[in-house]
Design a protein with these regions (language model features):
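Conserved glycine-rich Rossmann-like NAD(P)H-binding loop of the short-chain dehydrogenase/reductase
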Residues: 28-44
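A glycine-rich helix->loop->beta "capping" turn
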Residues: 55-58, 78-91, 97-99
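Catalytic loop of short-chain dehydrogenase/reductase
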Residues: 95-115, 123, 134-181
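C-terminal helical subdomain
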Residues: 167, 182-183, 187-193, 199-237
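The beta1-alpha1 cofactor-binding region of Rossmann-like NAD(H)/NADP(H)-dependent oxidoreductases
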Residues: 39, 62-75
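Canonical Rossmann dinucleotide-binding motif of NAD(H)/NADP(H)-dependent dehydrogenases/reductases
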Residues: 2-33
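Hydrophobic positions on the long internal alpha-helix
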Residues: 90, 125-129, 133, 172-173, ...
Length: 237
């Protein structure tokens, strides 16, 4: 690996937005660690991208379940065996469990599970990979959030656990940005994207959804931090 090659780790990257983000980062010249809790799917995704680029050294699979602390620690230990530096962490993995619930009918199990993955998971991964990020000349953390987490637009009652978890993730972003002044730490809304989560009627392709994430990871000014973005513009939350 060239010394100046940037290194990224993308969680939830075996399909959907995370897979496309990984693809676009390879195109930008990154070495990518592709995270997935499903080992078979993750390895297949990494092989697919390496075949696309005819380069077996571009994408590496890293097994991780961000809802499990032990899995996060194992992933960090495995990463350390392959690299001592990380330039960009993209906390993309997330779940949607309550799109058929409202705030009056959601259950403790759904609510706690959603927050554990979408909010706490992103924080714990950031903490675990912080030693590697500190070795970068320009470390970045990108948290994939959602317009559903915007309080400024008012709640419409849809998927309360999911939306609240994304509001809280934006809060984590602000806290991390304050604690890590030499880092660029941002949240981003990819828009309504045609994925398993977004559904077939969504208005954006995965390539369009990934674009803003990749921009924050690769090209946005390092001085931009603690903000919430969509389409390369800061939005309120």
């Amino acid at each position: 690996m060239p010394r100046n090659q940037r290194i990224a780790f993308v969680t939830g990257a075996n399909k959907g937005i995370g897979f496309e983000v990984s693809r676009q980062l390879v195109r930008e010249g990154f070495r990518v660690f592709l995270g997935s809790r499903n080992a078979e799917a993750g390895r297949a995704a990494a092989r697919k991208l390496n075949r696309e680029w005819k380069d077996q050294e571009s994408v590496f699979f890293l097994e991780i379940d961000i809802a499990e602390q032990e899995s996060i620690q194992r992933a960090a230990a495995e990463f350390a065996r392959q690299s001592n530096r990380l330039d960009v962490l993209i906390n993309n993995a997330g779940i949607l469990l309550d799109d058929d619930k409202d705030i009056l009918t959601t259950t403790p199990e759904i609510f706690e599970g959603t927050l554990r993955t979408n909010t706490l998971g992103a924080l714990l991964v950031s903490q675990a990979f912080l030693p590697f990020l500190r070795k970068s000349d320009a470390p970045r953390i990108v948290n994939v959030s959602s317009g559903g987490g915007q309080l400024t637009d008012g709640a419409d009652g849809w998927a309360p656990g999911y939306c609240i978890s994304k509001t809280a993730l934006n809060g984590v972003t602000v806290q991390l940005a304050a604690a890590l002044p030499d880092f660029s730490v941002n949240s981003v809304c990819p828009g309504w994207v045609r994925t398993d989560m977004g559904g077939a009627n969504a208005t954006r392709s995965v390539a369009e959804g990934a674009s803003g994430i990749v921009w924050l990871a690769a090209d946005a000014p390092q001085s931009e931090t603690g903000k919430f973005w969509r389409d390369r513009k800061v939005i309120p939350w």
